[in-house]
Amino acid sequence: MGEVIKNRYEFVVLFDVENGNPNGDPDAGNMPRIDPESGLGIVTDVCLKRKIRNYIETVKEDEDGYKIYIKENVPLNRSDREACKSLGINDDEDKKVTEALKKLKKSDKDADIKLRDYMCRNFYDIRAFGAVMTTFVKASLNCGQVRGPVQLGFARSIDPVISQEVTITRVAITTEKDAENKSNEMGRKSIAPYGLYRVEGYISANLARKVTGFSEEDLELLWDAVINMFENDHSAARGKMAVRELIVFKHSKELGDCPAYKLFDAVKVQKNDDIQYPRKYQDYTVTINDDEIPDTVEVKRMI
């Protein structure tokens, strides 16, 4: 899969939404997620990783080494069995697979590592984000939980976000009775008029070397996926979404040169003084304070 990364990375992503719902909250009628105390908008890490997975799947189309483990409506144990078959376990029933794995563990002390390496080698999202593989957990194998080198936090908006409900009507009718009554059907959709969000991420070269084998080629694909994660994911519900900035910090060594928070603090995003209600990206100014960044850390603006 290529050379494993040797440097630690942190990165900051800025993305915005215009007249859309970037991440609906099922606990609030699918309205945009909002911190109830600060009013800041929230987008979960799970939501963003889904976008990245979808982009990888679209670009690579199940190419060897770039399959996606976490897929919509696809049983995870189907992928787990691929690894089992590589070690000669061909059963399809979960109970039989679990028993066979327990026996294999007794006869082959390296079975855990072989299964883990197979999954990491074949599935990009396991290599990047890690995974919990229930089939192996049930068999008490240590490879059931893989911690990935790439981690994301929640995205938060720079300023408070207003959740606005819009009433919509549909000229199409559902039943003949509706046609007789000549009644339109009405519905509602929730949008945020505008929000600029910031998310911070981490990439551990140490975990890449010791666990998943996340490579330089994987890293370049990750940057490409982050930059384009909304480009093939447009929908009426999400409105206009775009990644505006990807700022990458590359350390000179595997364990890094300074704490991550110092690098994140060096990136300032501020609303322009003459703007009261921001409605576009140009209403903000993004600055990087180079004086707060060690000379051994390379800074690159990818967009």
Language-model segments: which ranges?
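RNA-binding basic/glycine-rich loop and surface signature characteristic of RAMP-family CRISPR effectors
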Residues: 1-303
